[in-house]
Amino acid sequence: ELGIEKVVHTSTSEVYGTAKFVPITEDHPLQPQSPYSATKIGADSIAMSFYHAFDMPVTIVRPFNTFGPRQSARAIIPTVITQIANRKNKVTVGALHPTRDFNYVTDIVRGFIAAMRSIESIGEVINLGSNYEISMADTVKLIADIMGVEIQIETDPVRLRPEKSEVERLWADNSKAKRLLGWELHYGGLNGFARGLTETIQWFADADNLKKYKSGIYNL
């Protein structure tokens, strides 16, 4: 009636909660460990209900841990980069033990465009992830290595999630995205992650970009 060709609904890897098995496939149990993930699970259900009830051409995309230029200052990668860029030797972060599946923003954007264009993905839930797992601690160390500095890492209790809401492990199975969307990573694996971090660091090296971030303040 409205001429809608496709609806691509943005979900999140957070709907899976702490991984019960890895890599995480799209049929992994959903676990609302936080109000945020609970609302996303609800939104996913509403989106899929329109597909079932009205044949609306819906695809649900679940991106894992996207990073890159212009990311929110609350995320770990810009938090670490901006602190180091402002010549702080002691870098303050949250929990260091959880693992994540980080994805450079251009890979994720290409995945969304592919989902928009794909007929085969209608009525499907699709993970967009790198299939590469790394801990927060190793991520911080990698950033410091790329920026050529030695740092002390300090955990700030203010930056810790409530214990039961912390997602301890995320690691995506991206085989469905490859199969249905023809999606391939340009920034995959450790080397790809390092290249994405390097490009992100270069963006923050511009003084006009860096000044938009308050490295000493953690905004809730």
Where are the regions that the model predicts?
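C-terminal substrate-binding subdomain of Rossmann-fold SDR/epimerase-dehydratase oxidoreductases
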Residues: 85-220
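Short clusters of hydrophobic/aromatic residues that line enzyme substrate/ligand-binding pockets
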Residues: 16, 23-24, 67, 91, ...
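Short beta-loop-alpha junction of Rossmann-like oxidoreductase domains
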Residues: 19-20, 69-75
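Active-site proximal helix/loop that lines the substrate pocket
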Residues: 12-15, 65, 71, 117, ...
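Short coil/turn segments at alpha/beta junctions that flank glycine-rich nucleotide-binding fingerprints
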Residues: 2-3, 53-57, 73-74, 87, ...
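N-terminal Rossmann-like NAD(P)+-binding domain of SDR-like oxidoreductases, especially those catalyzing
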Residues: 1-66, 146, 195, 199-207, ...
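Conserved active-site helix of classical SDR/Rossmann-fold NAD(P)-dependent CH-OH oxidoreductases
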Residues: 41-48, 52, 78-81, 110, ...
